[in-house]
């Protein structure tokens, strides 16, 4: 088997995680911490790309990595237009949408830009893999009860699909041949119904849908939410923070640290026990609903993300859903590995790279 060396880039708000992989094997993994004062000099996130590029190249050089030996560079996908899952070649249309913040401004938008900037100088391909805007929802799943208010697909696509592929391999099947319910449990929680390689329905774990999580409110009583919004007590930004950042465990018990909450549960704290059970209850309820999307024909239920390390939480969820299908636990997430594997599938010609194309108001993916 030929050796493919891949540089992987995952930008965060104040750090950039990089990895160098020889096929699936990590040669280097490092988190580059950026000085907040240095970052603060830039008016827009996108203006940081040159600074981050030079920092990445310096770190690679310090570790003796010869970039001329790279076969591809893969960046984290940013806030693009809705696209189907897969590995995409970074092209001009994508770069324009990333730079302009078509669907929002976020550090992840730098992923594709940095990959392209480094790869183009080496005459090798630049890719992104399964960004959060992956949208494979069926038309029936998009309808809400208010005209003009469509349900949107925003979820942990990279980790959900990477773990789904691993589980398929463990079951000696292709991802495209299975029906899986994949639950990512981290700062946000998303439950995806994976039908033959497509996520045909998933809760919007960012904007108030589904189970509450360590720092997100999830689905809340809408009537009471409307009353709160128009009470005159809160600004818009304060209400948004109640849903994302200051919701969930933060609102209910004062911390987003699930380990601390578990310690409280183990000491017999009745409030912590009830709240932690409630989070597990809501996750299980979401999984149950998603099972109906797949007509109950489920090959496996998969639990992943940082919270999947919690035996208390996992056991509570299992008790309620293991009658639906076998529950497989893959705790944690490895975004660098997932990005490398996405690029590798293309380099090995196991998949064709997809092209990001903008046609008037719609984006289509062409394999």
Swiss-Prot record:
Its EC number is 2.7.2.7. One of its GO terms (molecular function) is acetate kinase activity. One of its GO terms (biological process) is acetate metabolic process. Keywords: ATP-binding, Cytoplasm, Kinase, Nucleotide-binding, Transferase. It is an enzyme of class 2 (transferase). Gene3D superfamilies: 3.30.420.40. It catalyses: butanoate + ATP = butanoyl phosphate + ADP. The keyword Ribonucleoprotein does not apply. Its main location: cytoplasm. It is found in: Cytoplasm. The keyword Transferase applies. Pfam families: Acetate_kinase. One of its GO terms (cellular component) is cytoplasm. Belongs to the acetokinase family. NCBIfam families: butyr_kinase (TIGR02707), PRK03011.1-5 (NF002834). This is Probable butyrate kinase. The gene is buk.
